[in-house]
Design a protein with these regions (language model features):
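Conserved helicase motor core of SF1/SF2 NTP-dependent helicases
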Residues: 1-245
Length: 245
């Protein structure tokens, strides 16, 4: 890996430069105040969490509650002045994967939801909706982008170039959205019942789901096979905390 080779050449520690490193993890390691968090799947592994993360201001509950449970051992606190409650739900959509982990039915669901978001945003006098579509898998986000560019402009009667520009910045993999936020996030798991290994990869550690959930300020929705995935690590917390059924 190119980054790893550069890191080794300059004798930079792995915790500062790696695929797993983020601005947040570097900031945590630079902070002398904090606590050691045990890994949810391996109690022998611990991660240093810096004290600024103890107070969380981006997300409403239940997103805050989900992140707190899966990634922070319930150590985070929400400021007392944040009393509103957001929405978390799970759209139970099944189908067969047609392009790696991409399920056409998931894409069709996203088209309908985003068409509604655009119509609502325009009614409210906004230029565009504050919505992200995030997936663990590159193939899923690529195919959803393609489907949206084909179908969404006609659904909402907006100039195609404007819609395409919005699609390019609002749909992507989890890693491309680190540090960003939106009012609403749709998390598209993808995969069918022959690809359980791919789903298991997405929840090996809480990091990926934690980033996805905490992009959403007010609303977070999972799109995927509920029966197959709801009991898997960390997904079970999202399923349990959903308040839109």
């Amino acid at each position: 890996h190119l980054i790893d080779n550069i890191r080794k050449n300059y004798n930079v520690p792995e915790y500062l430069v790696s695929k797993e490193a983020s601005v947040q993890s570097v900031a945590d390691n630079a902070n002398q105040y904090g606590f050691w968090k045990s890994d949810a799947t391996d109690s022998n592994q611990k991660t240093w969490i810096g004290i600024p993360l103890w107070v969380h201001r981006r997300c409403l509950k239940p997103m805050f509650t989900i992140a707190n449970q899966i990634a922070y051992n319930n150590k985070m606190v929400l400021p007392s002045n944040i009393t509103k409650v957001g929405k978390t739900g799970w759209y139970d959509v099944k189908g067969n994967a047609v392009q790696k982990q991409f399920v056409k039915e998931h894409g069709e669901k996203v088209v309908g939801l985003l068409a509604d978001d655009w119509i609502e945003a325009i009614k409210e006098g906004k230029n565009e909706p504050s919505s992200f579509v995030i997936s663990p898998f590159s193939a899923v986000q690529q195919q959803i982008k393609r489907m949206l560019k084909q179908r969404l402009p006609a659904r909402i009667d907006i100039q195609r170039s404007k819609v395409n520009q919005w699609i390019d910045k609002s749909i992507g993999t989890v890693h491309t959205f680190q540090g960003k936020e939106a009012q609403k996030v749709y998390f598209v798991i993808g995969t069918d019942n022959t690809q359980d290994g791919a789903v298991n990869w997405s929840c090996e550690k809480p990091n990926l789901l934690n980033v996805a959930v905490t992009r959403a300020k007010k609303e977070f929705y999972v799109i995927g096979d509920m029966q197959r995935i709801q009991s898997k690590p960390f997904y079970e917390t999202i399923f349990k905390e959903r308040n839109v059924k």
